[in-house]
Amino acid sequence: MKIRVALLQLNPRIGKINENISNVYKLLSSSTQQQPTPPPSQTTITTTTTNQQLNSKFDLIVLPELAITGYNFPNSTAIKPYLESIDKFGPSLNLGRELSIKYQFILVIGYPEFSHDDNKIYNSCAVFNRFGQLIYNYRKSFLYETDEVWGCNENPIKGFPSIELDFSPTSNKIREDINVNETSETTTQLIITNIGICMDLNPYKFEAPFNKFEFSMSSYSQRAKLLICPMAWLNPSSPSILDNEEFDKSDKLELAQELESELKENLDSAEASWSTINYWILRFFPYLSHKYSIMPKWFNNKTSTEANNDEKVTVLCCNRVGVEEDVVYAGSSCILQFNNHGKYNDATDLTNESVELIGNLDQINESILIKEIDL
């Protein structure tokens, strides 16, 4: 099955909701041509497409973690004006609903949630079907330190349960909405899907064993073929991760400005953060063909009696760009596919032949990546 996917790589500024929403619409309505280069103080909006114009029909669009609010809030008071809930939509959820209706696609958008059920704050992402209906709400399970600063809570539902998205032309629902008495002649095109937000890819609290691979192992055991990962992933050189004993806040702010300037000097020739993409690949180790990846592969390998020859596993990493105080984000949004061609080697990065980079964006520009992919 082929679907058209779009990843929006955004630079949401805290306190500028309307401007952030406007940038989303600009990206979606832009042509395939790169926009004129703005002044150095601004971020270029670029597009990367394949085989279709931007106004062509999408099947799925993904926006980053906390897509239009920004992420690095200093406390719970600061984020409070931006909180919304599934029973009281705010700007993020309204945008998701409006876009999914306008373009008639499945949409995933990250937003800060306040739950009226337990009066807690969550870092969440909502899934809308092509009719603007909220069909699934996922809450981040593994929290980064910034989440805790602004009062976020862990997902009370453990284990990264999967859902089934229906990509058939007339129905975009999760499995719970589907009649169990449907006949074999049904046109549903269900894809087992897992959603993980940024830190969910890492070991729990950075304390769990590195090779536990909680998110990817859970996805693998549920035979998920589509993994959707909205992110606010840091640049490996982000000053925010430097030792506080060696660098004070003013030092980090200065270093962040220097890094931002350095990146912007190469706007037109900007590349992805390849170390970031390679790390993401490593975090999906169970899907790699590697001599130490001992999980029996259930997809694609023609020599396997277990495998379905038509299956690949697709990972959508939708990250953000920009700078928030001393935090510099990595961008580099990408589409990865694991193919299990049966060629095993020691590589855990892009040089491993069992993983394909279908497309990627750079680490500085607000951009859109559009690809047609086989699921």
Where are these regions (language model features)?
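Active-site catalytic loop in hydrolytic enzyme cores
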Residues: 88, 114-231, 235-244, 249-252, ...
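Conserved beta-strand and immediately adjacent loop positions that scaffold enzyme active sites
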Residues: 4, 124, 332-334, 367
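CN hydrolase (nitrilase-like) catalytic-core segments centered on the catalytic cysteine
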Residues: 91-108, 202-361
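Active-site beta-strand/loop signature of hydrolases that rely on acidic residues for catalysis
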Residues: 31, 36, 40, 50-80, ...
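Residue-level recognition of beta-strand->loop/alpha-helix junctions
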Residues: 9-11, 64, 72, 139, ...
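Solvent-exposed strand-loop boundary residues in beta-sheet-rich modules
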Residues: 11, 131, 339-341
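Short loop/turn motifs at secondary-structure junctions
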Residues: 4, 56-57, 104, 192, ...
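N-terminal glycine-/serine-/threonine-rich phosphate-binding loop
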Residues: 1-44, 49-60
